[in-house]
Every structure is written in structure tokens, then in C-alpha cells.
Amino acid sequence: MTTEQGIVSLAGKVAVVTGAGSGIGAATATALAALGARVCCAGHNVENVERTAAEIRAAGGEAFGLRVDVASPEDNDEMVSETVARYGAVHIAHLNAGTGHWAGVLEYPLEEWDRTMAVNLRGVLLGLQAAGRAMRDVGGGSVVVTASAAGLTGGRMSSAYSASKHGVLGLVKSAALELGPIGIRVNAICPGFIASNDLMQQMGQELDLASRFPLRRPGRREEVADLVTFLASDRASFITGSVFTIDGGWLAGGIDLRDDSVDQATSDARVTALANTHSPNGDVRSPV
């Protein structure tokens, strides 16, 4: 709902957020709760999602943590059924969990390819199916999927991640066409480099990424959460099937992580090592 003053309110709404243990997911879960939603904080690391939920409760909100493997149909169904059992419905889903591995396309390990697709693409489909069925039961809802700027362009050493995020955008647009008539809106956000945790901030500093952005800084996870909460709310009631870039203007000039002080092979190796070091499995934001 929206207050008369135009301020977004999510009082009475129920949300599920995947990848809620840290980074963008934790920020979004916190922001949704601050606006009045009751939140299921889902993710692969139960300690992290329970910590996010505890912080929400300490601030006066309602939330619980749940371990969820987003690539598992059973886990997605449990996420939604447990949320409905506790709070009576699901109105909002932020499908945010993601992972990635950086390697050259000719040597890309198939097991890493399969894992990336399982989390980033299959996981979105399964979350959309489970949450969408619950939203259908209450007459509609809003699904917001975290894609990436890498879903709008290619990226060196990140073929699986980029391919998975391109696939996510196709899924979002197709789902919006199908689900619009039953009141379910589906949109995607495409973050650029977000300093979502200390390691990602360190990576940005090591690659001097701020100098590559028109705004001369990386994004903050709270800025992404603000976009998600808007799309989740009735303020965005006529928005569906859309893709929102939040990258500080990076894509306007083309993504390039190259270190110009060294040759291309050395630059690729450096970026790959940094990306894989700073991207723990399960709640990853790509450098692109």
C-alpha cells in the first residue's frame, strides 16, 4: 500500500528474500521489514540468515530465518509453505541468491558452469514458481529478481555468470507476460559493482573500480534495497516485465575491468583471481 503522503508502506505484506544472509539480500530484507512487511530470510547459510532475521526483530520487525538451497524444488516449496504457515500469505518475493566462478571460456570447468546455472537460473525459476503459486492464491503480488549488469553485456572470464544472467532477463520478461493477467508483476534489477561486504569493497579498491564509474564510487547495498522496495510496493503497480539498471552509469560507457598497466593475459588472470577470492559460494555479487 501507499500512504496519503506518498511514502511507501508495506504494512500487511509478507515477503520472502533469498540470499538474505548478507549483502544485497540482507539489506533488502531489512528494508522490507522497516516498511512493515513480515519477512522470510532465506539462504544457504542458516547462521547468516538467522542473524539477519534477529537484527530485524531487534529493530521491531517480524522475520524468521530459513536454510534454503535455491536449486532445490523441495526447499523452495518449504520456503513458501513455511512463510504461509507463519504469516498467512506471500505477496513479495526478492529472488536474489546468486553465485559465480571466473575462468576463461575455453577452459571453463563444467561443474562450475552447472553450479552457476543451477543457482542463478534454475533457482530463479523454482523460486518464481513456488512464490507465484502463493501469490495467485491471494490475487497477485510482486516478484523482483536480482540479475546483473552482466546480463546486459558480455564479460571477460565470466561466461557462465553472464549467460545465466542473460537467461534470467528472458525468464523475467516471459513470466511477466504470463502472470500479469492474474495480478503478479515480475521485474529485474541489474546491479553493477556493489560494495555489498568488506571483501567486495576491498576488491573494488584493488581494481580501482571507482575511477571507471561516472559517479566515481561503487554502489551501496542500501541503494539497491531502495529500488527493490519500490518495485515491491504498490507505487510500482503499473511496472512489470521491466529491467532496471543500477550501476552508477557504468554500462553507459561499457564495462571494462582491464588493468591497462599490464598485458591482457596478465590482466585477465588478476581479475579472475580477485573475483574468485572475493566471491564466496552462495551469496555472490559479480564484479559486473
Feature locations, PLM:
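Active-site helix of classical SDR
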Residues: 128, 164, 172
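Conserved glycine-rich cofactor-binding loop
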Residues: 14, 21-23
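Conserved glycine-rich Rossmann-like NAD(P)H-binding loop of the short-chain dehydrogenase/reductase
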Residues: 37-51
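Alpha-helical segment proximal to the catalytic Tyr-Lys
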Residues: 133, 177-178, 237
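Residue(s) in the substrate-gating loop at a strand-loop-helix junction
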Residues: 148
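C-terminal helical subdomain
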Residues: 188, 204, 208-239, 246-248, ...
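Substrate-binding pocket helix/loop in short-chain dehydrogenase/reductase
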Residues: 104-105, 112-114, 209
